[in-house]
Amino acid sequence: MGICEIHRNEMYVYFYLERGEEAQLLGIFKEKNSGIKKAEQGTCRIVDLICPDRKNYSFRGGKTFYDMPAYLFYMDSCTWTSDSRFEIVQYSEDRTLKVTTCYEFAENADAFSCKSILENLGDEEITIEGITSFCFGAAAGYEKGKSDPSEDVEIYYAHNTWSEECRWVHKKLKDVGIWAYGNLCYDRFRIANHSGFSTGEYLPMGALYNKQTDTSVLWQIESSTSWAYEVGCFTPEYRESFLKTDYRQQIYLQLFGPDMESAGWYRRLKKGERFETVETAVACGMGRPESVMKEMTVYRRQKRKIMELPIIFNDYMNCLMGDSTTEKLLPLIDRAAEAGCEIFVVDCGWYDTGEWQYTFGEFEECRQRYPEGLSEVMDYIRRKGMKPGIWLELESVGLDCAGLQNMPKEWFFQRHGKPVIDSGRVHLDFRVKEVRERASAILKRVISRYHLGYIKIDYNLELSCGTEFQADSPADGMLQHNRAYLAWLEEEHAKYSEVMFENCGSGGLRMDYGMLSRMDIQSVSDQEDYRIMAVIAANSASAVLPEQAGIWTYPLKDADRESCIMNMASAMLQRIHLGGNLDQLTEEGFALIKEGIQCYKEIRKEIPEGIPFWPLGFHSFDAGWLVFGLHLENRDLIMVCRREDEKKRIHFPVQKGVEAVNVLYPAAEKRIAQKDGIENDIVVELERENSAVILEIIYE
């Protein structure tokens, strides 16, 4: 076959497919490239496979990129299995291993997903210590006498930890240790996760930006357990790529699920057994990665369609903090209904007194908290015109749960023959049928008993790599559990299609599209300070669809006008998770919350169609100003926030043809927002620090 061109939307993807040779991904382009040619062997293969007994002549240092002779060979088998899915099949030389690599192209977006499926066709076990879900060996090039990709290519990655989610940074490759000097190179940059907190340290995302060509490639790994990505360089003769420069040195990219290096993962593939890698997604486009988020957003919406955006009140954050009672809840319910909320969630602690963090598991209401029963509270919520919701943690059991002693050891994650303990919890294994049945029974009981319309599912433990029990490796046990759990979630969501399911992992510590393709809303953070929550909110649409991103807004009882406004504005272009002491606010403060909710109800139907954009780029956590918006048809909605910055004015670019600039919220507050003298620029003036505004930009 030779060169294979795929043209989807505005993207050209080129493969080299020739019988008896390894399949190659030659490049991803925004324009047709008639001069594309076969790459040097070992440089652009579509799959990298790590086997301990594979002949390895590669001088690579710690890299997992193998610049070595082919291991897999294309044998005349590539197929469009649907209008959007392209599959390439390769075999090992002895025909004992079959690898099918699947590219699923998004509709109306320059993006695709990628994964591989392995099948053992031989009689002997094959041990796999790692396999790429996506591999691209042509991300940039190098030519002596000119500046190198270490200088011209930037990598974007995002720190993500408890209460400090979505902290994007970008650096030149040389500043992360990749110094492309045109010789044999061991340099690499690797980001990885090794536990069930899939986003406990970093987002499973990244990007490469080439300033010479002003192009970016952006990726996400859709794993709820271990994952890794690696960027490095090598020096072949091949010089074509999407991130094309005039250099000979190439920058490669590999995306993994669990592997040996990052999580101690391995899998013994028995005769006839199959293994599927985690799914990944890749998007490309002109400009910096913030611009390419458009393509990723369209792709994500094809994974999960969310159209209903009800206003949620949750009694936890800066409110009852897990100490709810009937007496405390009833006035909050009254005030939430008056404010315009449509769902009222009773968060953790409803099942016990005292150290409720460690007694959960049976999920029976605590009569000391609710003397007439929790049903009294839930009925009252419904009478006030809202749907009731409740908190559950279903993948673990508290160490002080009364029923723990009756659960067999086989139900739990184990290492060294004993259940693994973390954060006062033991982890349940959803590969076990009885564990799934127990969770299903809990869901059925609480949904039917309390007539729920909302379930918040939390996850609060860090178990490192996983479970050894009935698994080749702990990380593979974790992967198998997670796949069983996600399948169970899909089944339960289908049973209760009218119930909204929230994903929470100590806030945003399990914020991946393995989970989010099956959940309705994500708790983005547990951050309690609205000033920090604002920057998390402004960046969160990079990780989560705006219509899935639950943003806390929690005015304190002594909140002044500006803090009430900033609380509301931070959430109004995404999803409102209202908390705080609504029943103790001043009348002025409550009126501002109510106004914000009413404004949100007028714009929310457009949020699932909006394309996020960042006129100033992703925000650092010490940014003085925040500007985040949604492109809509003929208009933009923009949140502008002045944090602790001496400057009262901010200028930022928008699209051409501005007709009008309107302040949507707060309507009665003085905010200067207008077209600047500079073409396509807007200027906003906010008198006070820690203040905000929601703008509408109307175009001609």
Which role does the model predict for each range below?
Residues 308-310, 319-324, 366-367, 389, ...:
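Active-site-adjacent "subsite" loops/lids of carbohydrate-active enzymes
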Residues 116, 272, 381, 458, ...:
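Conserved, mostly hydrophobic/aromatic
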Residues 267-286, 638, 690-698:
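Short Pro-Gly-centered flexible turn/kink motifs
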Residues 311-315, 344-346, 388-392, 455-457, ...:
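Hydrophobic faces of well-ordered beta-strands that scaffold small-molecule active sites
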Residues 13, 17, 21, 485-699:
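Active-site-proximal substrate-binding groove within the catalytic cores of carbohydrate-active enzymes
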Residues 2-246, 666-674:
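Polysaccharide-binding surfaces and accessory modules of carbohydrate-active proteins
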Residues 328-350:
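Catalytic domains of carbohydrate-active enzymes, especially glycoside hydrolases
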Residues 105, 128, 249, 352-401, ...:
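Acidic/aromatic-lined carbohydrate-recognition and catalytic surfaces
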